[in-house]
Amino acid sequence: MSEPQKKKFKSSNFIDELDQKRKNTASSILNFPFIKKRVKVLSAVDEVAKNSKGILYWMFREGRVQDNWSFLFAQKLALKNKLPLHVCYCILPKFLDATLRHYKFLVESLEEVSNDCKDLNISFHLLHGTPNVVVLDLVKKHKMGALVVDFFPLRVPSGWVEDLKNSIPKDVPLCQVDGHNLVPCWVASDKLEYGARTIRGKINTKLPEYLTEFPPLIKHPHDSAFKIPTIDWKNALKDVQIDRTVDKVDWCKPGYRGALMELESFITKRLKNYNTKRNDPTEDALSKLSPWFHFGQISVQRVILEVREYKKQHKESVENFMEESIIRRELSDNFCFYNKNYDSVEGANAWAIESLNQHRKDKREYIYTRDELENSQTHDDLWNAAQNQMVREGKMHGFLRMYWAKKILEWTPSPEDALAWAIYLNDKYSMDGRDPNGYVGCMWSICGIHDQGWKERSVFGKIRYMNYKGCERKFDVKSFVRKYDGKVVNKKNDISKMFKKK
């Protein structure tokens, strides 16, 4: 693959420039060499029945219109069979520990998706309920000829897909597309990988084939045969059963256009410092794109295509960003796809489980309840500041996420409590919670996955250790603590209180 030439960013026409790139690639998905290995046919049939009334794409992980392989594949089927194209999204009554913060970000972006679909003569349906019920109803009611679904390796959405596989009409193909990873998860590797070093080569050898420009999703030439219900966006969240005390954050604008604004900001302002300053929580050097990645509002592949055009100016920064955004991110999907215990201590390697068990009864110098952790009530002002950042902004600097999770292991009664509480707090407050990257981050910090055994010590065993003094050597801790009001709560602990009878 030839290296892109040096480029100067032109922010005024970024959206138009991307549209032109797609048009220059192909006139539509029908004229594009779509890689069939991106798709898994989950049903016994793979042909669209002649009496079908449309093609349906159930959007879940990939919440965008353009640069979406799932949507493009659905349009390919619809164009080939001369059928209307429909897309639906299901507003769940509850999803793990998602809060109003996440649901508002989602719904505002879906309104943008709906408007974009309208411009392209594609029918958008906002459904309420669990997908294995309401998507199936839509397929049956309107005689959809095929159902296209996103790949998402987490347990709950995978269960919905399995239910649909078992209940969808026998003559309706069910196709799953990995539009999230550059190299589809099942293509990158057919097994659970030990770490980045074992999957890196497998992905990099396949990148030249998969890291291509996208064709456009075009205005659809076939009209829907039935009227689409009007969407009441103001009341879209009226009946969801979520925590409404955790409200939206202001720094990230929902949707594809909001994502492009953040990408533009990263390329023009922060990319040059990514290599040297990305591990310093007091510096503004990260992409900040993880909320949009998680909700699928921008394609990681699109971001890589744009960022790598600046490799001549910022070689090390671009290379490191690609390592984090491709290798590390796709390693997380690999872990969750091939390890059913991706959010449990049981999912750790044997050496880590043995080591944690050997130190299970070690005395903890400090111990906290989940509520105390959630409310930043520890003796550690840096930890409290990091927790405050996550609660207020819906994000935490990557370096501090490691320190934050490891201290939870140090200050809780058991590894099981530590992992459960870290996942709960991350899922509740982080804009990118409930994501393979989040689970893997907690599992790396607490259970040593994708890592090796280190010098043995109390509580941690052979799990990699991090401490306050190490952070002081890395960055200006006092500055970060001041910014996020990290107050010390002097609380010398007596572990015995955790086991007193009530």
Predicted feature locations:
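Residues in well-ordered beta-strands of folded domains
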Residues: 58, 175, 200, 264, ...
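Active-site-proximal binding-pocket segments
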Residues: 280-481
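Phosphate-binding glycine-rich loops and adjacent basic patches that engage nucleotide phosphates
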Residues: 31-38, 65-80, 96-102, 121-128, ...
